[in-house]
Amino acid sequence: MNVTTTRKDLMIVNMGPHHPSMHGVLRLILTLDGEDVIDCEPILGYLHRGMEKIAENRTVIQYLPYVTRWDYLATMFTEAITINGPEQLGNIQVPKRASYIRIIMLELSRIASHLLWLGPFMADIGAQTPFFYIFRERELVYDLFEAATGMRMMHNYFRIGGVAADLPYGWIDKCLDFCDYFLTAVSEYQKLITRNPIFLERVEGVGIIGGEEAINWGLSGPMLRASGIEWDLRKVDRYECYGELDWEIRWQKEGDSLARYLVRMSEMTESIKIIQQALEGIPGGPYENLEIRCFDREKDPEWDGFEYRFISKKPSPTFELPKQELYVRVEAPKGELGIFLIGDQSGFPWRWKIRPPGFINLQILPQLVKRMKLADIMTILGSIDIIMGEVDR
């Protein structure tokens, strides 16, 4: 009598780039032994558009509409990093009111990004209801953006020396009303999700990253803070006016997918706290500074050495980047978003290197999914929170 034996061959499966859980055009080549993942190889580059090379052929103002296509769910942060570099190179003083407006916009953008992380993350692991709920609050954030900037996404709002336009009449009251409402919405999400036994079964103890391991991999943002490291660039660098506001770094020590979920949920409430303080303490005065102080320049005898130069808000190449190099960074929703900028005394940057948080956070994925089940890939990838626009650039 012949006994049929089960085949033990390994199976190679392509996940993506057209998979609904890939959050864009990511492709994973998986080696499976039954349902166990033996190996995982991410294939990137499907959304590569040459963003760094484009920057070398544009003035800073001309380049602003391009940068909102990196992380297209948190566009205020890409705009902030794009103008922070030239501002620091040119020693441009940003008015206090403009700095407060920037903080408000950045934190609203962080909330919108975390909301659109939460919905698909829950849908990936089988919970459909939160996916529809998050769009209520996200629409309110986009209504605020539309009232202030004219655009719901891709705002093109930040400018060298300030912002493009002041806040419209009644906007501050509208934003304060949103803050009060949003806190009740977050508590509703937590009742719905956080203690749900099926949700906990899917995320608890899945994709564990230790603190030292997170540092060695160069992780940042919620990925790092969920592993027990209290590191937030808003506290470390104190850029804009974050040092004047009272808020806390939210972190967890477990390092699993649940910890990353908890960090992002609590970050949304901290963002509301920051926005409320900024709205109540926003000073008067100008919302832009269009003068650049010219230090370290030889006096031009023909013009008697003007100490100031005018920054044009139009795309004309009037703002020259000094011959220096600089690394500047902000705390984006996904982690540390930075650019390395080299100027050469012209209107165009000589080098514009982007440090995208999603690209670096994604590197740890193959290690996290090994020896896990195939279904856990969705949980782990969702907890990393990637946007392929900034990964591929």
From Swiss-Prot:
Similarity comment text for this entry: Belongs to the complex I 49 kDa subunit family.
EC number(s) on file: 7.1.1.-
UniProt key word Chloroplast: yes
Pfam families (alphabetical): Complex1_49kDa (PF00346)
UniProt xrefs under InterPro entries: NADH_Q_OxRdtase_suD (IPR001135), NADH_UbQ_OxRdtase_49kDa_CS (IPR014029), NDH1_su_D/H (IPR022885), NiFe-Hase_large (IPR029014)
Originating organism: Oenothera biennis
PANTHER family linked: NADH DEHYDROGENASE [UBIQUINONE] IRON-SULFUR PROTEIN 2, MITOCHONDRIAL (PTHR11993:SF10), NADH-UBIQUINONE OXIDOREDUCTASE 49 KDA SUBUNIT (PTHR11993)
Reaction(s) catalysed by this chain's protein: a plastoquinone + NADH + (n+1) H(+)(in) = a plastoquinol + NAD(+) + n H(+)(out); a plastoquinone + NADPH + (n+1) H(+)(in) = a plastoquinol + NADP(+) + n H(+)(out)
Gene name for this UniProt entry: ndhH
Identification of the protein by name: NAD(P)H-quinone oxidoreductase subunit H, chloroplastic
GO molecular function terms attached to this record: NAD binding; oxidoreductase activity, acting on NAD(P)H, quinone or similar compound as acceptor; quinone binding
BP GO terms, sorted: photosynthesis, light reaction
